A protein has these predicted regions:
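Polytopic transmembrane helical bundles with strong interfacial aromatic enrichment
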Residues: 1-226
Length: 226
C-alpha cells in the first residue's frame, strides 16, 4: 500500500523541509529593504510553477475529453483547473504581501501583477461557464474548448506582455530583459530550498486534486452519468 502513496509522503517531507529550512537557510541581502523577506520566494514563486503544471494537466484532460467524450476526463480537467486556480490566487496573495513590504503597497499596478490578475479572471470565467450550463455533455464540451483557450492565454498574460515593459520585480529594470526569474539573485543556498519547494507544492496540488476527483466521481455515479 505504501508504494502507491510514496509521492504523498514525498510531498509532506518536501513541504516540511521547505517550511523549516526555508526560514533557516542563509539568504543573500540584495538591498536594505529586501533582507529576510526574500524567503517568501520559497512560497510565492513555487505557487506559480505549481499553477502552470496543474493547468497543463487540466489542458491535457480537456483535449482527451474532446477526443473521447468521456465525462471522466472532464472531471479530471475540472479538478486540476480548480486546484491550479487556487494556486494562482495563493500566488497573488503571497505576492501582494511581499509587494506591501517591498514596494509600500500590496498592489502597485506592476505589469506582472496586472497580467496575473487577467490570467486568473480568464480562469474564473471557466468556472462561471460551467456553473451556467445544466446539460453535462454540453457543459463538458464547451468547458473543454474554453479551457484550451484559457491555457494558451497564460502565455501572453504572464510571459509575453509583462516582459515587454519594465517591472518592479527583480531583474525587471534596465537591460536585464525583465525575466520571469532573475537567476543572478538566487544563491546556491536558495536553490536547495526552491527546487524542493516547487516539487512539494505541486505534489500537494495533485494530491488535493485526486481527492476532489474521487468526490466528483462518486457524485456522477449517484446521478447515473457514469
Amino acid at each position: 500500500m505504501l508504494h502507491k502513496k510514496w509521492w504523498k509522503v514525498l510531498s509532506f517531507i518536501l513541504l516540511l523541509y521547505t517550511c523549516t529550512y526555508g526560514f533557516l537557510v542563509k539568504v543573500p541581502k540584495l538591498d536594505d529593504r529586501m533582507q529576510e523577506s526574500i524567503r517568501n520566494f520559497f512560497f510565492h514563486v513555487p505557487m506559480w510553477f505549481g499553477m502552470m503544471i496543474l493547468l497543463f494537466v487540466s489542458l491535457v484532460y480537456s483535449i482527451k475529453y474532446l477526443r473521447s467524450n468521456s465525462l471522466v476526463h472532464d472531471v479530471y480537467a475540472q479538478a486540476y483547473a480548480a486546484m491550479g486556480l487556487i494556486f494562482g490566487v495563493l500566488g497573488i496573495i503571497t505576492g501582494a504581501l511581499w509587494a506591501n513590504y517591498q514596494w509600500g503597497s500590496p498592489w502597485v499596478g506592476d505589469p506582472k501583477q496586472n497580467g496575473a490578475a487577467i490570467a486568473l479572471l480568464i480562469y474564473f470565467a471557466y468556472f462561471v461557464l460551467r456553473g451556467s450550463l445544466v446539460d453535462a455533455e454540453k457543459k463538458a464540451r464547451l468547458s473543454a474548448v474554453y479551457n484550451i483557450f484559457s491555457f494558451f492565454m497564460l502565455f501572453p498574460t504572464l510571459w509575453i506582455l509583462p516582459r515587454l515593459t519594465e517591472s518592479l520585480h527583480p531583474g525587471g529594470q534596465g537591460s536585464d530583459g525583465n525575466p520571469g526569474i532573475n537567476g543572478k539573485d538566487m544563491s546556491a543556498n536558495m536553490r536547495t530550498v526552491f527546487y524542493p519547494a516547487v516539487i512539494g507544492w505541486t505534489l500537494l496540488g495533485v494530491w488535493i486534486s485526486t481527492l476532489k476527483i474521487r468526490v466528483q466521481m462518486i457524485q456522477l455515479k449517484k446521478e447515473g452519468l457514469l
